[in-house]
Design a protein with these regions (language model features):
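Structural recognition of the conserved hydrophobic beta-strand(s) that form the central parallel beta-sheet
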Residues: 110-112, 288-291, 320, 345-350
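Interdomain helical connector at the RecA1-RecA2 junction of SF1/SF2 helicase-like NTPases
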Residues: 359-489
Length: 499
């Protein structure tokens, strides 16, 4: 309703004889008119919700944010020291009492906050179920949670972000009938992709897309990326490429559930149908789901009779979004597609990227797609409880003290500790790497997002090829197998960098 831009209303006041029975079109909301056009923003303090029965008193909220007079954000605030759970429990209580009905049913996003913590979540509707698994903390580009209320106000609840969140980053999922709002990392990825496409010089011959490394939520993010591109008219076609029929069927079902009422996501039963939809100028054929096999067949089918079609399609601005990119990039099919359509821009989504040390024939993620646009690794997902966690334990093949000393000697260009300490220049370097306050054991991102190396970052992978390390791994498995497998009840996966 809100993203429908306009709504028709028939006047029904019989006393207004001049207009009775006539229809008028009311402009309610335009997702593109951000801080511009006819958009108006207002803040309501302490809105009063009439009680739904004589047994219930009127309820008083804390804040509402209005766009064009419609309440789209509802905020419940608590003072310092009061857990934020009390704020969202109060929202749930109001919802169960029927407060958010009528005009107030237009609330899209709830925000529960105290000065030190904020969570936001989509309105599940009058029949929906509140689920804390979908209560999110906003974070910065590097996935560091933002909780200070001043930063939340300026980065999440301000214009343009609040307008964009309602217009572009919520999804009315037809699959379960529940409104969904995107997490911060999904927003950063989708907006980064849209930004790259908007700045692309299509005839430069140097256009590159990018790589998204996300451990969860990839399907919604990839769809929203495509939707942003289509709505901006920055590309003629956005094609979702999968490398398996099962993935394609699943993706098509999910994309269609995410689509707005006026959007169509096209399937392709064969290569001929794919060619037809790629050539089409119909708006309904903008978003297409197909397989990498069908796309690569366009060049080879019918002995080159597709030349004219390829020429027509090649003139279009094409964006290809590759699902599970770590699988699809191997082999010759992606190379064939790039050769057939040299103007195309590729974006890859994966939770397990292919790094340079594991790549074959320039098939690392950055070689195929371009620079990494955003990262939400499994470590971020475990911290935020968006993916299943691990129960790790560490078995030391080498003592941390010995590893640190070996790195310190190497950096000091010394063979022994005595050799390092007898030379002032070498000693300064040696002490730097021996000092945990200057060089930590493990690397971590700095304030600017750049990686600060730790001792382990200076170690070569060859240490894991030594007989000493291999023997320690084998002994640990043997000694603990009965306990960890619950006497053989469970199997195990052995992960290694090389066989």
């Amino acid at each position: 309703f809100i993203n429908g831009k306009t709504v028709s209303v028939k006047r029904d006041n019989p006393d207004d004889k001049a207009h009775f029975g006539k229809e008028v079109s009311l402009k309610i909301y335009d997702r593109m008119e951000i801080a511009a056009g006819q958009s108006r923003y207002q803040i309501v303090q302490q809105p009063i919700f009439p009680g739904k029965s004589k047994m219930l008193n009127d309820r008083r909220g804390d804040l509402m944010l209005l766009i064009n007079g419609m309440p789209v954000f509802h905020l419940e605030l608590k003072r310092s020291g009061v857990p934020v759970s009390q704020a969202y429990n109060q929202i749930e209580k109001y919802a169960h009492e029927g407060v958010f009905t009528g005009l107030f049913s237009l609330v899209q996003i709830f925000v529960a906050m105290n000065p030190e913590e904020t969570v936001y979540f989509a309105n599940p509707g009058p029949d929906g179920k509140f689920n804390t698994d979908y209560y999110f903390h906003w974070a910065d580009f590097n996935n560091e949670p933002i909780n200070d209320w001043k930063e939340i106000a300026s980065k999440l609840l301000s214009i343009p972000m609040a307008h964009q969140l309602i217009g572009f980053y919520t999804v009315a999922d037809d699959a379960d009938g529940v409104l969904k709002v995107m997490r911060s990392y999904q927003y950063y990825a989708a907006s980064a992709i849209s930004d790259v496409v908007s700045k692309t010089k299509w005839d430069s011959g140097k256009q590159r897309g990018g790589d998204i490394w996300h451990s969860s939520g990839k399907t919604m993010t990839s769809f929203k990326s495509a939707q942003l591109i289509a709505n901006s008219n920055d590309a003629d076609k956005v094609v979702f490429l999968t490398d398996r029929i099962e993935l394609g069927t699943q993706s098509l079902k999910e994309y269609r559930a995410f689509a707005d009422e006026n959007e169509t996501v096209q399937a392709t039963d064969n290569t001929y149908e794919l060619i037809t939809k790629l050539k089409s100028i119909a708006t309904a054929d903008t978003l297409i789901v197909t397989s990498i096999q069908k796309m690569s067949n366009i060049r080879d089918e019918e002995g080159g009779k597709n030349a004219r079609d390829i020429e027509l399609i090649g003139k279009k601005r094409l964006v290809f979004i590759v699902d599970e990119a770590h699988r699809s990039t191997f082999g010759d099919m992606l190379a064939i597609i790039k050769e057939t359509f040299p103007r195309v821009i590729f974006f890859g989504f994966t939770g397990t990227p292919v790094f340079e040390e594991n790549a074959k024939k320039n098939n690392a993620q950055t070689d195929v797609f371009g620079n990494e646009l955003h990262r939400y690794s499994i470590a971020d997902g475990i911290r935020d409880k968006n993916v299943l966690g691990f129960d790790p334990y560490k078995v030391l093949t080498f003592r941390d003290k010995d590893v640190r000393q070996a790195v310190a000697l190497e950096k000091a260009k010394a063979t022994t500790v005595a050799d390092a300490l007898n030379d002032p220049a070498k000693a300064a370097v040696y002490y730097k790497y021996m000092d945990n306050t200057q060089v930590k054991m493990y690397g971590e991102p700095g304030p600017d997002g750049k990686w600060i190396k730790g001792i382990e970052d200076y170690l070569p992978n060859t240490q894991y090829l030594t007989a000493e390390h291999k023997q320690t791994v084998i002994e640990d498995i043997k000694e603990n197998w009965l306990t960890l497998s619950h006497n053989g009840k469970f199997h195990a996966i052995f992960a290694t960098s090389s066989i």
